[in-house]
Amino acid sequence: MIRLQHDKQKQMRYGTLQKRDTLTLCLLKLQLMEWRFDSAWKFGLGRLYLG
């Protein structure tokens, strides 16, 4: 019984870690996109990005 509870806690902890990793990845992607957009804008490619 104690072992089962321990495993459950481990799973929960792993779940939160996974969520945090996903969030970090999303933020990194967002930053990368913003950076690319800024670079493009600086080089006068903003109109191409905007369509």
UniProtKB/Swiss-Prot annotation:
The gene is rseD. It comes from the Bacteria. This is rpoE leader peptide. It comes from Escherichia coli (strain K12). One of its GO terms (biological process) is regulation of translation. InterPro entries: RseD. A short protein whose stop codon overlaps with the start codon of downstream rpoE; a premature stop codon at position 12 results in decreased expression of ECF sigma factor RpoE, thus they are translationally coupled. Keywords: Leader peptide, Translation regulation.
